[in-house]
Amino acid sequence: DDVIKQALAGMIKILYIAPERQENEEWIKATREMKLSMIVIDEAHTISTWGHDFRPAFRRIIDLVKLLPVSFPILATTATATNRVQEDIQSQIGGKISTIRGSLIRSNLMLKVIKVSSEDEKKLWLAANLNKIDGTGLIYTGTRVDTESYSNWLTHVGINAVGYNAGLDSDTRKYIENGLMNNTWKCVVSTNALGMGIDKPDIRFIIHTQIPASPIHYYQEIGRAGRDGKPSTIILFYNDKLDSKGIPTDYSLPKSFIDNARPSIKLYERAVEKLKSEPLSERAIMKATNLKQTQVRVIKSDLIDQNIIKEVKYGSTKEYEYQFGAPKLDTEKFEALRVAKLKDLDSMVNYVYTEMPRMKYLCNFLDCNENTNFDNCDNTNLKKESLEVPQELNNKLQDFHLNYFPLLNTAIATSKTVQGTKWKILITQPNVLEVRKDDILYKSCTMDNYTSVF
């Protein structure tokens, strides 16, 4: 309330807000009364359905933009937009738009790919080589469980490391973030929960143990290294060993996240049936359908976009009302987006196998086609990495496997030993299950799409 009063009184020059604030009726009313001189949309790719990090709440910004005169100054910035995303942003903002594109080339990033056949080979390489890299940096993993596994392994071999993920309490996250800025650890092992808003100029290395979902994700995450312009090491591990379904091991996890990004169609239908009876608030939808808040928010955003429901106000209460005569749910849009994301994932896999300069490959994907002499990767001037490690480290890894037990705050749904193989099912995130075979990730899926492995 105090901030709104100060803004209305003209006492604030620059006001930073989260897009979710645009869902607050008091805030919407206040912005209409403020003497605004400019709107800046940071991370503008998030307002595009085709953007790599689309967030429905960002669409609320467009609702505000539409209330303003066509000539009102708006600046939208992003470091990761393809031509398709750029065109989508332009069409949503509307009006006369000028586009300024800077170079995306990061010549100080030394790009390498290491192909492995197991998680153990990743761990062994890190143990043997991490201390040879100057400075401090980040190691990105695909799951919360792996942040703990890798950080504990590195600690086990005498490397100063700490694990970070969104499941930690806010005080612990803040402590680790401050430690990162002050070079307290050789490396912070994290999911992609760490990075947004981190502006540390001297991150000397970024290593991915799991392939990201697209070259755009990868470019954004490695772009946190070497912002001081000095050389920084960038490494991507890729396990191309085929699983029981003939799919490369490291392809399975990001593919499962893409396949399960949206709730199942039956959950959309469940929500629509409840809303046909009466208008419901978000919390009431959750209660009536027994769905989680994240699921309900995705569902209601899609239903609003397709004009199946609309938002209505009853005093200060916001509810969602079914529009009788509404069109049927168009699942083809969901499938088109899923196919597009799988295509992006395939492009990320192609990055592993490409023979062209790796930075050129990433820039081409982002529609930045510059003729530059690229010489900063293992396809050009840099030596390819070896997987050879001292036997002593193999012994330490065996000892680690015998004595390491995950302490991460995960609920064990079930565990079972079948013909000598240990199977364990963990709830690692809201609505996400991990199936682990002898403590190695076997598959990941949502609870809605889980079928027994036994």
Question: What do these predicted ranges mean?
Answer:
Residues D1-R270, R283, I309-E319:
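Helicase motor core with emphasis on the C-terminal RecA-like subdomain
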Residues G10, N183, D367-C368, D448:
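Short loop/turn hinge sites at secondary-structure boundaries
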Residues P19, T428-Q429, F454:
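Structural motif
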Residues F54-A57, S264, K341, D439, ...:
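Short, conserved glycine- and acidic-residue-centered signature motifs
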Residues P73, V453-F454:
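Short glycine-rich phosphate-binding loop at a beta-alpha junction
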Residues L109, I139, V435-R436, L441-T446, ...:
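Buried hydrophobic side chains on well-structured beta-strands
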Residues K122-K123, T414-S415, K443-V453:
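A short, well-structured juxtamembrane/interface segment
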Residues I207, I211-Q220, G226-P430, R436-K437:
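C-terminal accessory region of SF2 helicases/translocases
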